């Protein structure tokens, strides 16, 4: 028991140190995402095809399954797919290019964030609300729920960097 606990504590401390070392770049990325992804959600609600919604529903289900298994790498993969599929369905080529650059910069952030299973659990309901708004074609709600979701991501980041609030 004590050996496992000390390994977990060491892993948590390494995660906190990584977040602190990268805090400014991560906050920059979160701010850019919070400017662009609510717009992408609005545009998807207005422009999406039925196959876009089916794909997003499938991705969300895979995300939930990965959270239930506490598989951080798969959670990160499907979180990225969830957000990227929304951006792609916006049909806005500049948003798609910027999203690609942002995804590359936050890949490590996603993987480290989802090692803390509470962060993954915290994403299920916001993703479900975004999906439901998109399925209803409600652009205002899709934009609102995406903005709220990314505000929580920012709060999780601040919690991890400022308070060292991480438990693996």
Say what each PLM segment does.
Residues 1-42, 159-168:
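Short linear motifs at protein or domain termini
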Residues 29-112, 124-129, 141-152:
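Conserved amphipathic alpha-helical segments that form helical-bundle/coiled-coil interaction surfaces
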Residues 119-121:
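Active-site loop of classical SDR/Rossmann-like NAD(P)-dependent oxidoreductases
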Residues 139-168:
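C-terminal effector-binding regulatory domain of bacterial HTH transcription factors
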């Amino acid at each position: 028991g004590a050996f496992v606990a000390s390994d977990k504590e060491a892993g948590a401390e390494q995660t906190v140190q990584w977040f602190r070392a990268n805090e400014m770049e991560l906050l920059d990325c979160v701010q850019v995402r919070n400017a662009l992804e609510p717009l992408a959600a609005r545009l998807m609600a207005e422009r999406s095809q039925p196959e876009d919604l089916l794909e997003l529903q499938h991705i969300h289900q895979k995300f939930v399954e990965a959270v239930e298994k506490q598989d951080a790498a798969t959670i990160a993969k499907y979180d990225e797919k969830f957000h990227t599929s929304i951006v792609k369905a916006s049909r806005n080529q500049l948003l798609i290019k910027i999203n690609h650059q942002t995804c590359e910069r936050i890949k490590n952030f996603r993987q480290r964030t989802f090692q803390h299973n509470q962060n993954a659990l915290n994403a299920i309901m916001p993703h479900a609300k975004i999906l439901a708004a998109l399925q209803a074609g409600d652009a205002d709600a899709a934009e609102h729920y995406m903005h709220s979701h990314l505000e929580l991501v920012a709060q999780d980041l601040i919690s991890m960097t400022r308070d060292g609030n991480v438990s693996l």
